[in-house]
Amino acid sequence: MTKPIPRIGSRRNGRIGSRKSGRRIPKGVIHVQASFNNTIVTVTDVLGQVVSWSSAGTCGFRGTRRGTPFAAQTAAGNAIRTVVDQGMQRAEVMIKGPGLGRDAALRAIRRSGILLSFVRDVTPMPHNGCRPPKKRRV
């Protein structure tokens, strides 16, 4: 009979590697992706390594409430709270998408006390690329 393979890193063992929470990050980039259904806020360092992230879904909002401005504000506050504790003082903001949470997320970032170098809209715009889907008839 074969021997059972020892399970390395099962769910009960918890996290195997240590989290990089001890790093000091003075400057970073805050990416806000605001769709009509959800808002995702990702905070990275200057090299692009993800330091913290949050979304309206992980903050406990479900269904259509995930696309609301209040959900975006909560998600931005959660993502930024951890990096402010790690010492972030300056940040650049990249906003992508047409969602309702764009302005609310930016307002929450401004209120957090981080100095913003610039705010840039990086929503992808086609230069007459693919044909869009047909219009809905309700």
From Swiss-Prot:
Keyword Ribosomal protein tagged: yes
Annotated stretches, region: Disordered: 1-24
UniProt cross-references to Gene3D superfamilies, sorted A to Z: Ribosomal protein S11
Keyword line: Chloroplast, Plastid, Ribonucleoprotein, Ribosomal protein, RNA-binding, rRNA-binding
Chief location: plastid
Comp. bias regions, Basic residues: 9-24
InterPro entries (UniProt xref): Ribosomal_uS11 (IPR001971), Ribosomal_uS11_bac-type (IPR019981), Ribosomal_uS11_CS (IPR018102), Ribosomal_uS11_sf (IPR036967)
The keyword Transmembrane is assigned to this record: no
GO biological process: translation
Compartments reported by the entry: Plastid, Chloroplast
Subunit note: Part of the 30S ribosomal subunit.
Similarity comment text for this entry: Belongs to the universal ribosomal protein uS11 family.
One GO CC term, this protein: ribonucleoprotein complex
GO molecular function: rRNA binding; structural constituent of ribosome
Name of the protein described by the UniProt record: Small ribosomal subunit protein uS11c
